[in-house]
């Protein structure tokens, strides 16, 4: 499988796992009767997503050196920032977006190495 596609899949699964963990944390605001059931559902989805991401990560490490693959995983910062704004209405400051832009520039530089 193409290394870039594999990296994108790892990033997406990791992002999904993070969003599910956030959702599980927010379930504690629910009435106590529903809290545990909802939390466990979101945590189960998070574990599955993160577990699949880890398996694909191991496959990716067979194709790329760790010194190249790991910095490119920083794409997660971009995905999680965008998802947090979209799904949770979280606001990012200009400084945050400049940091995201710097990360994207770094990923671009790393991808030329491949």
Swiss-Prot record:
Residues 43-112 form the EamA domain. GO terms for cellular component: plasma membrane. InterPro entries: EamA_dom, Flippase_ArnE, Small_drug/metabolite_transptr. SUPFAM superfamilies: Multidrug resistance efflux transporter EmrE. The chain crosses the membrane at residues 38-58, 64-84, 94-114. Its main location: membrane. Pathway: Bacterial outer membrane biogenesis; lipopolysaccharide biosynthesis. It is a multi-pass membrane protein. GO terms for molecular function: carbohydrate derivative transmembrane transporter activity; transmembrane transporter activity. It comes from the Bacteria. It is found in: Cell inner membrane. Belongs to the ArnE family. This is Probable 4-amino-4-deoxy-L-arabinose-phosphoundecaprenol flippase subunit ArnE. It comes from Yersinia pestis.
